[in-house]
Amino acid sequence: MAVGVFDSGLGGLTVLDAVQRRLPEVPFVYFGDNAHAPYGVRDADDIFHLTCAATERLWAEGCDLVILACNTASAAALKRMQETWIPKDKRVLGVFVPLIEALTERQWGDNSPPREVAVKHVALFATPATVASRAFQRELAFRAIGVDVEAQPCGGVVDAIEQGDEILAEALVRSHVEALKRRMPHPQAAILGCTHYPLMEPIFQEALGPEVSVYSQANLVAESLADYLARKPEFAGAGTESKFLTTGEPRSVSNKATQFLRRRITFEAA
């Protein structure tokens, strides 16, 4: 019973780390489309086709359930995939859902009308493609009313993290937070809408201030996955071994991933 985890690069490893800790008995197959990263600057059609290709590769590894551990793919491709492409015996889940569940304090299956929630002012930090898709605002509007969302496209942050340039990544995060606070001086909550950003969570929190609740995805996604598999065990696929696949150069990606997670990760060519 293997579960697939997909990202355009290394950010999804933050999600993989959390789901492995939460579900140590489940094998996971991670697919990084490093040859085409970052997705955050690509158009929606391009993201759709790349995400479908990666998902098919994970199905071939015996993963009937695939997690898009990439907000750009979840925002720009998932709805179209679910409506036009995914067969009935497979499931593809995005990473927005657990965030919105946490923010609105309601379960995904709860289809009651949108209602007032405690949080009124939300800052969203994400890639330019995720911000342009407005997927977060759309999903939030189905569940909550009266929430003001101010979105900040965080150009350059993913590239800096993938290159291992922490000083540049930190400087960019601080400048993006400053830019957002000029438009929304007092957010109550901040959504880190990219799976790379948990690595920068302390910097976001420091720049935003202690009064802002920062929602980061990895642990929320892990809890959601555990709940999903408990309810739908038939989607734990036939695969039996954990592995790491990449469209990039395996040695280079392995070295970056090892730096990224601070434990040895060995990728093989997809």
Swiss-Prot record:
* Name used for this protein in its record: Glutamate racemase
State the top-level EC class.
isomerase
Q: Which residue windows are transmembrane per the record?
A: none
Name the family.
Belongs to the aspartate/glutamate racemases family.
The record places the active site at C70 (proton donor/acceptor), C194 (proton donor/acceptor)
Taxonomic source organism: Cereibacter sphaeroides (strain ATCC 17029 / ATH 2.4.9) (Rhodobacter sphaeroides)
| Keyword line | Cell shape, Cell wall biogenesis/degradation, Isomerase, Peptidoglycan synthesis
Name the domain of life: Bacteria
Which gene is this protein's source? Answer: murI
Q: Which GO terms describe its molecular function?
A: glutamate racemase activity
HAMAP family per record: Glu_racemase (MF_00258)
Q: Please, one GO biological process term?
A: cell wall organization
